[in-house]
Amino acid sequence: MAYYRTPHDVTALPAWQALKDHRQAMQDFSMREAFNADPQRFNQFTLSSCGLFLDYSKNLINAETRNLLVGLANEVDLKGAIKALFDGEIVNSSEGRPALHTALRRPVGDKLSVNGVNVMPEVHKVLNQITDLVGRIHDGLWRGYTEKPITDVVNIGIGGSFLGPELVSEALLSYAQKGVRCHYLANIDGSEFHELTQKLRAETTLFIVSSKSFNTLETLKNAQAARAWYLAQGGSEAELYRHFIAVSSNNAAAVAFGIREENIFPMWDWVGGRYSLWSAIGLPIALAIGMSNFKELLSGAYTMDQHFQSAPFEQNMPVLLALLGVWYGNFWGAQSHAILPYDHYLRNITKHLQQLDMESNGKSVRQDGTPVSTDTGPVIWGGVGCNGQHAYHQLLHQGTQLIPADFIVPIVSFNPVSDHHQWLYANCLSQSQALMLGKTLPEAEAELRDKGMSEDQVQKLAPHKVIPGNRPSNTLVVERISPRRLGALVAMYEHKVFVQSVVWGINAFDQWGVELGKELGKGVYNRLVGSEETAAEDASTQGLINYFRGRHRG
């Protein structure tokens, strides 16, 4: 029976008990000692695939740990789950849908059926539609209401319609096509809208409204504001079609807004928002970096799909990262995971992975609705490079919580300045090294004595300089951030999240928790503006409504 039809209690599996026993045996495991004892440890726990190099040797593991974790993957039938995902089975049980974001990067000629229909021709038809639009804009053939070419594209969307495209278009800024600037408008905050439109001219701006339903509150409000701004700047209703296109499955609503049918790019219910950057949601990416680079992005993701499906689990990058996350979250008590990119252009990867991981695996019931019996997804957080070293890395080094980390770093910078990149790379490696090595009390005391301190001073200060070490991390190295390697990197994290959902028996492809706040928000809004006089469901919310109404002006 498929994993999503009969979810298991993972804690009842023999492999889980074996890992519990192994965890006790690893209580006094020291990475420092493990490296000293085994000169081959680095070679034993590194892996290269799809343009990515993974060093996972700085983890609280040995060969037995890896074997036991792979045994757990086998007991939950991970192989069958991967096949179900790629074959288009109904892995999203609560919504009765497959999750086929991987279809978006499959090559021409592949076949994949959904409800008896081969979807691949439609996938490539839309890709051709994107190619045509991108070509017309880059060639200056798409013109605004004053017949000037488009110079700015604004993507109006939130969540998966924003985070993935923003990550990729900024990460690949070095591949940006001249003549077209891409911007993102997501939050329902007038200040964001104001600051953005200050930079734009309506006559040369194209808005992409990205919303599957064409009814997402934040997106619709921003689209309406953009429409009003366009008209106020001199645009006309008759020429509106030149300045607004849509990515949506609600054609009727988009047409009613003023968008022409031929300028509506479809979305499919078998692609979730946080997995959608490979689809027409990626239009701003293609406009930013060009169509050939966008196809390279898809190709890189496809190579990771192939690796994920074919590599043995002990040599499978997404599988190993997922199992390490299970190891720390379920057996070492880790509650969060840090993503630490040492690259300015990758500064938004943490935001994308927050949605990808936390919206997917922030679940407390299994696929069949029964409660989970163990912790599931961690809090994902982090930030870029050396900035974090002067902020929150202190907690990683000397705090009381175990927080695994992923360091992501390129070997080559697109913008070399003196020896900056060598220092950046050195800082990345030294941070992972410091997390692993730490500093013992005798080492701290010796260091202070070498500085000429009195013994009394040494004894007072040394405990503050002790760093526990033995803190786990992975290091992901790429030669240089390119469309292909970035595609592989993002797809790797998608598959990592899926593997963990299989282990825990949860649904990685729904997000019912997001819906409750939306539903309650309507009632709160109606009370704020006075169209609903009944009190809110609780005194705190009503009190805050009253506070707003008593003070709000304008």
UniProtKB/Swiss-Prot annotation:
The keyword Cytoplasm applies. Keywords: Cytoplasm, Gluconeogenesis, Glycolysis, Isomerase. InterPro entries: G6P_Isomerase, G6P_Isomerase_C, Phosphoglucose_isomerase_CS, SIS_dom_sf, SIS_PGI_1, SIS_PGI_2. It holds the Pfam family PGI. One of its GO terms (molecular function) is glucose-6-phosphate isomerase activity. It is an enzyme of class 5 (isomerase). Pathway: Carbohydrate biosynthesis; gluconeogenesis; Carbohydrate degradation; glycolysis; D-glyceraldehyde 3-phosphate and glycerone phosphate from D-glucose: step 2/4. Its EC number is 5.3.1.9. It comes from the Bacteria. It is found in: Cytoplasm. The keyword Cytoplasm applies. The active site is at E359, H390, K518. It catalyses: alpha-D-glucose 6-phosphate = beta-D-fructose 6-phosphate. Gene3D superfamilies: 1.10.1390.10, Glucose-6-phosphate isomerase like protein, domain 1. GO terms for biological process: gluconeogenesis; glucose 6-phosphate metabolic process; glycolytic process. GO terms for cellular component: cytosol. Belongs to the GPI family. Catalyzes the reversible isomerization of glucose-6-phosphate to fructose-6-phosphate. This is Glucose-6-phosphate isomerase. It comes from Pseudomonas fluorescens (strain Pf0-1).
